[in-house]
Amino acid sequence: IKFNKKFSSQSPEQFIKKIIFKKTKCKYLYVSKNFKFGFKRQGNILTLKKFEKKYNFKNIVTQPFKKNNKTISSTFIRKKIRLGKIEEVNRLLGRSWCVIGKVIKGQRRGRKIGFPTCNLKLNDYVVPKRGVYAVKVKSNNFYKNGIANVGYRPTFNGQKLLLETNIFGINKNLYNKVISVSFRKFIRPEKRFKNLEYLKKQIKFD
């Protein structure tokens, strides 16, 4: 499901009809008592109850998941991602938070200094704290460790926010290939280096 302006403008019933009924053919829907959905969060558990029979599903209300007396919601998770608390996010999700996308062409600066990268846009994702992360990268034919940078590449005076990933042991062209980048650990904030030699040394150290 691609989240965009059109998708976010759906009324609660449109969401139920298109996503729950037609797309997923859901029979049992588990939500917390504070669940909100649809345009401007107009839908809630009473809305779901209202349309149960019409769209042939059963709505089951659960208690919010809490840890240390804090409710763990999608809002809470997004906040942690923005703060770079990736290890905590992964523990709470029960899996690694990831970004999936099609590799786009860059300026090949990474390749020129010996560290080729795969570049992904972050348009449809929560933007993690700018910096360097340990990651796992998955494609149709490999699953490799890597190191990724989220940011603007200040050493090169970059203007566009990108996720750049150096995949260990992979040196081939992956343009237009779909890859999944799973975030494992925040290493350090993004920074500007005096020159390329300093940058290369830091990448090797990372």
Residue ranges and their predicted role:
Residues 104-206:
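Phosphate/ribose-recognition catalytic cores of enzymes acting on nucleotide-derived substrates
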Residues 9-116, 194, 198:
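Classical nucleotidyltransferase
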Residues 1-6, 63:
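A conserved beta-strand->alpha-helix junction
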Residues 2, 33-35, 185-187:
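Short, histidine-centered active-site or binding-site loop motifs used for metal coordination
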